[in-house]
């Protein structure tokens, strides 16, 4: 009889522990990040700046936001006689990133904010005259000079414990609040 009682207590303890584990994981799964205000993007030349993103429900584990941008570069070509001609083909710019930035939620009861997140594209290695669409059939005598760098698209990811909790895509000329990923 004692053996039976010990076995019963042990199985009840294991069952209770299993139920507790299920309850804990399901409550974590049901917890969701609430977006109080969506971050808005402002495009200016080679840069994109995000402001105004407010989140709650993040808990006390620091959430990270990272903004990446892509864009293009335009060039002017100058021939050996000194005459400038705009290139006809934009060239992809080097992508840029804000790097991961904490939202401050671990210090503010689970509320996090994107106050001023900025990333910029950079000039790629100088292309050839042929790549930018001037200089005929690959003449190496043309001088290629950077004209403009333009950020054209941005991608925001908010992660917590390496899990994506919020994502937006932004486009030059598109809605300031972007679109869901």
Protein language model annotation of sequence segments:
Residues 2-4, 30-31:
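Well-ordered, non-transmembrane segments within structured domains
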Residues 3-15:
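Bacterial N-terminal signal peptides that target proteins for export
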Residues 31-181:
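Mature extracytoplasmic or otherwise solvent-exposed domains
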Residues 15-26:
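Bacterial N-terminal signal peptides
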